[in-house]
């Protein structure tokens, strides 16, 4: 009630927050924090290679945090109705975004559609120095 709701979905992460091998090497070279941050992603990197076919590893939580901290990271957004499916079965917990306003229900969230990759990477570098 009265709290601003912002959704940064996983799709933003795999579009704009993937760390490929070249960027991973650059981040590791920043020092012990950068090295640690990249090294703990080893299993995620293997999962991404095998399952999601992402060339690197994605960072959903860091990109969401960067969007919350700095408005300039948000490259494209939408104000829409968002609901969470609370029923049973495979869709339980799924977020449903009314992109077209067809439900007629009031807007209740800002949905981030794309992040500014360059700004995100700059913030990531700064945090890992």
Q: Where do the model's predicted regions map?
A:
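Conformational coupling and interaction surfaces
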Residues: 4-129
């Amino acid at each position: 009630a009265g709290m601003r709701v912002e959704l940064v979905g996983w799709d933003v992460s795999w579009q704009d927050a993937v760390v490929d091998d070249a960027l991973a090497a650059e981040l590791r070279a920043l020092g012990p924090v950068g090295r640690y941050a990249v090294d703990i992603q080893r299993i995620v990197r293997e999962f991404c290679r095998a399952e999601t076919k992402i060339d690197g590893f994605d960072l959903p939580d860091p990109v969401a945090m960067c969007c919350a901290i700095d408005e300039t990271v948000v490259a494209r957004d939408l104000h829409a109705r968002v609901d969470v499916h609370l029923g049973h079965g495979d869709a339980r917990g799924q977020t449903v975004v009314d992109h077209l306003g067809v439900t007629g229900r009031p807007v209740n969230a800002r949905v981030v559609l794309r992040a500014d990759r360059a700004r995100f990477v700059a913030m990531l570098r700064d945090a890992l120095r």
